[in-house]
Amino acid sequence: MSTQLHDVDPIETKEWLDALSSVLEYEGSERAQYLLESLVKYSRDKGIRMPHGTTTPYLNTVSVEDEKGIPGDQNIEHRIRAFVRWNAAAIVLRAGKKDLELGGHIASFQSAATMYEVGFNHFWKAKGEGEEGDLVFFQGHVAPGIYARAFVEGRLTEDQLNNFRQEVDGKGLPSYPHPHLLPDFWQFPTVSMGLGPLMAIYQARFLKYLESRGLAKTKGRKVWVFCGDGEMDEPESQGAIALASREGLDNLVFVINCNLQRLDGPVRGNGKIIQELEGNFAGAGWNVVKVIWGRRWDRLLAKDKDGILRKRMEECLDGDYQTYKSKDGAYVREHFFNTPELKALVADMTDEQIWALNRGGHDPQKVYNAYDRAVNHADGKPTVILAKTIKGYGMGASGEGQNVAHQAKKMDKASLKQFRDRFDIPV
């Protein structure tokens, strides 16, 4: 519709835009959003045909101005996260030395490690005195990472880790979350793919039922479910999302790891899976929180007065973004910052600094604020967090951003040394 309309009074248009700019500057984005929503409602009430859409710009939902500082000692958390990453990879690599047929997945947890660690350190409540705690549906393919953290905590032994996927003698660990095989460890089974999201919706609904019938106190408990962007194509994954909003399941949080890759290649090579999922969930009545860009992009976005960087972020497809992260900083400078104006934006940055521009799902500050938004909203809706990451993060040539990442069971010596140095592992 907008392509058929013409600006018959540019001066009046500028006055409206200046007024909105003033509201943003002096009263903030929430006030501006309220005014725009009021205008849209008023226009519809008057019978004006309005453009409609359920997606927002390809940017983080939580603005820099609205961010809270992440509590705790981030240096300590970074070190713990690095050790967990290393041990998660080592579990699969050691099993592979015995027999490659044992399998296992390295790349999935490496892409999601920050999201799990922020949850463990700052949000998830365990069962304790007078409290039943939160419920977490872990994505099936990240099991080695959860085992690795449990080892650091002293909950699992090295002997158990060495017997990953070797359970015949009773000392091993199952491939995936499996409460029957490891009842004191896992809360829910989440494989095959798609079962976790579906079960989590009905689990959250059951908690509401128990509270409303006076059978149990479940207020304050959250149901968290982690899944992959490729997993969302399973019919079960999105099959009941309308029920979740209809039932007002504000105790439910989906965290979708959008690393842009599935079992056998790109999820949406010629599209944008985050935008697609945002449309699906927003249309079904969910709160949507997008975590796309890490803090190292903040300075560039602040410099982007004319919106050329935002436009470039919007027009690039997932296949492009995956390609960038399988190359290097020089390639990103040439192909992402592909106009004189964009190149000028990063003229003061080295190729290494461009390469270090991080994605939101790998930035604990951005992840923390997304989780905080999810647990503190009070509008009676479930929340989905769409976090952009890199499949095989840290694996280098053995898998980072590669189509083969999901099936990677081993890493060559050079990649392993690079992994060690990147995360400063003392081995």
Regions found by a protein language model. Give the residues of each.
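Generic beta-sheet signal
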Residues: 134, 221-224, 252, 381-389
